[in-house]
Amino acid sequence: MDAHGVLQFLLFLALVLALTPILGRFMTWLFQAPVGRVEDGFYRLLGIDPTREQGWAAYAVSLLIFHLLAVFGLYALQRFQGMLPLNPAGQGAVPPDLAFNTAISFATNTNWQNYGGESTMSHLTQMAGLTVHNFLSAAAGIAVAVALMRGFARHSTRTVGNFYVDITRVTLGLLLPLCLVGALVLVGQGVPQNFDAPVTVTTLEGVSQVIAQGPVASQMMIKHLGTNGGGFFNANAAHPYENPNALVNLIHMLAIFAIGAALTNTFGRMAGDRRQGWALLGAMAALFLAGLGAAWWAEAQGNPVLGGIANMEGKEVRLGVAASMLFAVVTTVTSCGAVNAMHDSLLPLAGMIPMVNMLLGEVVVGGVGSGLYGMVVFALLTVFIAGLMVGRTPEYLGKKIEAREIKLAVIAILATPVAVLGIGGLAITLPMGQAGIAAAGPHGLSEVLYAFASAGNNNGSAFGGLSGNTIFYNATMAAAMMIGRFVVMIPVLAIAGALAAKMAVPASAGTFPTHGWLFVVLLVGIVLVVGGLTYFPVLVLGPVVEHLALSAGILF
């Protein structure tokens, strides 16, 4: 790790820590402010009563209906894009199975892409379909997190908020203003924003090349701020139009972390104790630092088959190894999934770290909203285990944690392993799944594991060697994405409803403090143990075996 790489990391960390309380304070105000005149007029236009709050079940039904309509709308737009305007490249209809996979992918905040954006989607589909869903899926995740915060903040009530009010406030009051400013900065740095057709140019080698362009900047900002990750171009953030220089690369990474980190501060403020938010952020930071250090060290060792020289395969020279590895860890500890280097080209142990980041449940900052409520679910499990050790009924933020909450937490925690290992196991064993695996041996297993870890945890990044655009993978990965999204969200909302109905319990001498270092250590341990016990065998069979084979000079 050189001084330049350390400086990049320290600058990134300092900016994230500086933004966290500022954005956290603003979001606290946004979610608690009374309805204004302009806002009330907007609700009247849509037929929404902002004073009518919902119980957790009604909130969940609204969430599911909203996503169902979103999937149908995006599917239809893809199927009919050939007959619609803003299609200068003349893109035809997207095949049914690919359109279904893409609609599920963007509606669930996954943004897994079994296609090349510039060669498949029209400008209209990119803007009115994919970009719009980047806003809405991110807003839905934040809304669920806010509902959970209200569960802790309220007592003796059956309501957790109004889904339509929450998603409107997040979209109009938070995401749109930040994206407008951010997109203008990106345009100033050379990111295109136009409606032009692809241009044909003659390269330095004297051959012709078609260069796509379009409304890139507007999609790039929400792609990162909403931890969506789907690229306008097939190369994603490795493409110079998406990520032209080091400054834009830094802006992208800050946008990925900004809301997820700040929501911990909002959580502490709404719970009445800011230390609780810092404790959660501390646990996230510990896991992030460990992953970053391990990934950097593993990639810096170089390829042993080539005498240990630096591994520049799949990386952009303008960014280098340090910025590529920092981005790889940032994008996988969150549910973003954007990439500025090809993860399939990382050395085995370095490639394992992004995989592990996802397999831990995307709770290290995680997706906007989903990272917070995922870590809170682990916090509930932590205080439950701590309570068992001392023989007391566990409490968290003044609420007794009982059997119902723990059962719901376990359902939420087990949802993604079922999707990853269950459906991924089918892909490994069935001929339809094996047909898409390009690499032999342990790396082929890693490609499939990475794909379903990405889909099940709503990340969207990939080991590019897997041929995913088949009916089998389009269907199975869509199923994994839905399980990873909704079978986690619904139990979280049920937990919010159960907590909101409870009376607040004053802290006593026997209450386990959840704002100190001991709680942070226990929380990190629970996250690692659950992830390690669940996925350790398959990780050994994949990247660990590949590393040992590579060290012995065996290639696959």
Swiss-Prot record:
Complex and partners: The system is composed of three essential subunits: KdpA, KdpB and KdpC.
Membrane topology, from the record: Multi-pass membrane protein
The protein's role, per its UniProt record: Part of the high-affinity ATP-driven potassium transport (or Kdp) system, which catalyzes the hydrolysis of ATP coupled with the electrogenic transport of potassium into the cytoplasm. This subunit binds the periplasmic potassium ions and delivers the ions to the membrane domain of KdpB through an intramembrane tunnel.
Annotated Gene Ontology cellular component terms: plasma membrane
Sorted UniProt keywords: Cell inner membrane, Cell membrane, Ion transport, Membrane, Potassium, Potassium transport, Transmembrane, Transmembrane helix, Transport
TM helices/strands, residue ranges: 3-23, 57-77, 129-149, 172-192, 247-267, 278-298, 319-339, 346-366, 371-391, 408-428, 486-506, 516-536
Domain of life: Bacteria
Entries under NCBIfam families matching the protein: kdpA
Keyword tRNA-binding tagged: no
PANTHER family assigned: POTASSIUM-TRANSPORTING ATPASE A CHAIN, POTASSIUM-TRANSPORTING ATPASE POTASSIUM-BINDING SUBUNIT
Principal location: membrane
Keyword Phosphoprotein in record: no
Protein name per UniProt: Potassium-transporting ATPase potassium-binding subunit
A GO molecular-function annotation: potassium ion binding
Record localization: Cell inner membrane
Organism of derivation: Paramagnetospirillum magneticum (strain ATCC 700264 / AMB-1) (Magnetospirillum magneticum)
Family membership: Belongs to the KdpA family.
